[in-house]
């Protein structure tokens, strides 16, 4: 994984999520992984405050990269082919076991990325639409409470809420996107977020159809 922050540019994320979707509405996992790598570089560029999320995302991306380079890689070309393959071959733990048989299944791994993507999508949209003096801690907490908080323990939720208090200003966030100006960053977010949202919506629908949204 390339964790260099200096190469981050919002345009790279936009291109990755654009290329993620085929004309048939399939989600191509190589581009999905590439888009997430860009988002991780963005989070890491802001310091340790997001490390609790970025470290977990990096671990999940590594699992997906191993699946993409495995002998079964053809089944992991798209989200749709992965779900069809793992569900039909019973490679997904559908019930809560003390010792899951498939803790690193693609479906379970992408579900964790899917949930984190929803949080980041809502937070970035909050940055895009908020005023210059908006409190990023509030924006981030609201996005977190609507998404990831539903899957975290009370202790984790409290620790995360405290960590968000150390977030930099909206201006710093926008400057970290490495555009020519904060105005251009806002404009680019407006172009990128619909693609991210579309990928999220397609994934959500697919997982719901196969009863995969509550995988342990």
From Swiss-Prot:
It holds the Pfam family GLTP. It is a peripheral membrane protein. An N-acylsphingoid base 1-phosphate binds at residues 56, 60, 108, 112, 152. Gene3D superfamilies: Glycolipid transfer protein. Keywords: Cell membrane, Cytoplasm, Endosome, Golgi apparatus, Lipid transport, Lipid-binding, Membrane, Nucleus, Transport. It catalyses: N-(hexadecanoyl)-sphing-4-enine-1-phosphate(in) = N-(hexadecanoyl)-sphing-4-enine-1-phosphate(out); N-(9Z-octadecenoyl)-sphing-4-enine-1-phosphate(in) = N-(9Z-octadecenoyl)-sphing-4-enine-1-phosphate(out). The keyword Lyase does not apply. GO terms for molecular function: ceramide 1-phosphate binding; ceramide 1-phosphate transfer activity; phospholipid binding. One of its GO terms (cellular component) is nuclear outer membrane. It is found in: Cytoplasm, Cytosol; Golgi apparatus, trans-Golgi network membrane; Cell membrane; Endosome membrane. InterPro entries: GLTP_sf, Glycolipid_transfer_prot_dom. The keyword RNA-binding does not apply. GO terms for biological process: ceramide 1-phosphate transport; negative regulation of autophagy; negative regulation of interleukin-1 beta production; negative regulation of NLRP3 inflammasome complex assembly. Mediates the intracellular transfer of ceramide-1-phosphate (C1P) between organelle membranes and the cell membrane. Required for normal structure of the Golgi stacks. Can bind phosphoceramides with a variety of aliphatic chains, but has a preference for lipids with saturated C16:0 or monounsaturated C18:1 aliphatic chains, and is inefficient with phosphoceramides containing lignoceryl (C24:0). Plays a role in the regulation of the cellular levels of ceramide-1-phosphate, and thereby contributes to the regulation of phospholipase PLA2G4A activity and the release of arachidonic acid. Belongs to the GLTP family. This is Ceramide-1-phosphate transfer protein. It comes from Mus musculus (Mouse). The lineage of its organism: Eukaryota, Metazoa, Chordata, Craniata, Vertebrata. The gene is Cptp.
């Amino acid at each position: 994984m390339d964790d260099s922050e200096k190469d981050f540019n919002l345009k790279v994320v936009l291109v990755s999520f654009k290329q993620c979707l085929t004309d048939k509405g399939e989600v191509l996992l190589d581009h999905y992984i590439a888009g997430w790598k860009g988002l991780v570089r963005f989070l890491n560029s802001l310091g340790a405050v997001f490390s609790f999320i970025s470290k977990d995302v990096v671990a999940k991306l590594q699992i997906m990269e191993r699946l993409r380079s495995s002998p079964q890689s053809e089944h992991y070309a798209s989200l749709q082919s992965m779900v069809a393959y793992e569900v039909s071959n019973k490679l997904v733990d559908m019930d809560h076991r003390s010792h899951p048989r498939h803790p690193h299944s693609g479906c379970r791994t992408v579900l964790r990325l899917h949930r984190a993507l929803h949080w980041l999508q809502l937070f970035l949209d909050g940055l895009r639409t908020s005023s210059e003096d908006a409190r990023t801690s509030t924006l981030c907490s609201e996005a977190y409470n609507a998404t990831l908080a539903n899957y975290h323990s009370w202790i984790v939720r409290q620790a995360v809420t405290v960590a968000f208090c150390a977030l930099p200003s909206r201006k710093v966030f926008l400057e970290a996107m490495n555009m020519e100006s904060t105005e251009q960053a806002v404009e680019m977010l407006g172009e990128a977020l619909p693609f991210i949202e579309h990928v999220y919506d397609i994934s959500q629908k697919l997982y719901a159809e196969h009863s995969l949204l509550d995988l342990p």
